Regions:
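C-terminal output helix
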Residues: 103, 107-116, 120, 255, ...
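Receiver (REC) domain active-site loop signature in two-component systems and cognate sites
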Residues: 56, 208
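His-Asp phosphorelay/catalytic-motif detector in bacterial-type signaling
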Residues: 2, 46-48, 72-78, 198-200, ...
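Two-component/phosphorelay signaling modules centered on CheY-like receiver
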Residues: 12-30, 43-44, 165-188, 195
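CheY-like receiver
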Residues: 121-156, 160, 166, 273-286
Length: 286
């Protein structure tokens, strides 16, 4: 998978660090040292994902994001805000400005590549839907692309597979009002529940005492009915090996504990949009 990534930061060393990492994964990299240049690049070039630093002199990252998301010509480009580790307020402002995801400094390689690849896939689907909408004047596609996924009538149906009561209660609290959440405390029951219900995402905890969560991920990917169902892994710190194995098995994304509500909301929104776009594309060719 390759794509054109725009890195926006006023500190050249930060730009170079991200550029080297992305080039190593065969992405094409564009750079901008300030907000106006970033906006101009998005308007003039085929940018697939923007990595945008929050703290920049003059026009900061929030204003850049807000302008990109308010312009119909650039609103479909995914924006990842790069924030300081302890600045929860930055994530709130980023969501309000329209950011699609967050990365915290220092940026972890696994997180960087997972977020970028996830959003590149979403951008590819968005481009395909935009093309079909422009050539066929398909009203259903246009409505899907413009829909706000936080509204009551489009609230996603999500399954959480977890056995720890405290963890379940935290996720329920985080997603209250933004998702229709079901819970399965037994992974085998969760498998059948996922197969029999029209979920738009499954959250799978790695913290089972006597069950390998990756087994469930593998089973869901092997079943025709759940092959394209987005899966997010909820892992503990230090489980990078399991996360990498999960990505190899086909999970779409992951979160590490302690889970941040804003990151969970943003990642879930990305996966739900991807699922709905995929469903629309498959329906349009049948």
């Amino acid at each position: 998978m390759t794509a054109r990534i725009l890195v926006v930061d006023d500190i050249p060393a930060n730009v170079r660090l991200l550029e080297v990492r992305l080039l190593a994964e065969y992405f094409e990299v564009l750079t901008a040292g300030n907000g106006p240049d970033a906006i101009e690049t998005c308007e003039n070039g085929k940018v697939d994902v923007v990595l945008l630093d929050v703290m920049m002199p003059g026009m900061d990252g929030f204003e850049v994001c807000k302008r990109l998301k308010s312009d119909p010509a650039t609103s479909h480009i995914p924006v990842v805000m790069i924030t300081a580790l302890d600045q929860v307020s930055d994530r709130v402002r980023g969501l309000e400005a329209g950011a699609d995801d967050f990365l915290t400094k220092p940026v972890n390689d696994l997180q960087l590549m997972t977020r970028v690849k996830s959003l590149v896939r979403l951008k590819s689907l968005t481009d395909e839907l935009r093309l079909r909408a422009s050539t066929t004047r398909n009203i259903g596609i246009e409505e899907l692309l413009s829909r706000n996924f936080a509204t009551e009538d489009t609230k996603p149906k999500v399954l959480l597979v977890d056995e720890r009561k405290s963890s379940i209660e935290r996720i329920q609290k985080m997603l209250r009002g933004s998702a229709d959440l079901d819970v399965a405390t037994d992974p085998n029951a969760g498998f059948f529940q996922a197969a029999e219900t029209a979920y738009e995402c499954v959250l799978i905890s790695t913290a089972f005492a006597d069950f390998d969560a990756l087994r469930l991920c593998s089973q869901l990917r092997s079943l025709d009915r759940t092959r394209f169902l987005p899966i997010m892994l909820l892992a503990d710190e230090g489980e990078e090996g399991r996360i990498i194995r999960g990505l190899e098995l086909g999970i779409n994304d992951y979160l590490t504990r302690p889970i941040d509500q804003h990151e969970l909301t943003a990642r879930l929104r990305t996966q739900v949009r991807r699922k709905r776009y995929n469903d629309q594309l498959r329906a349009s060719v049948t």
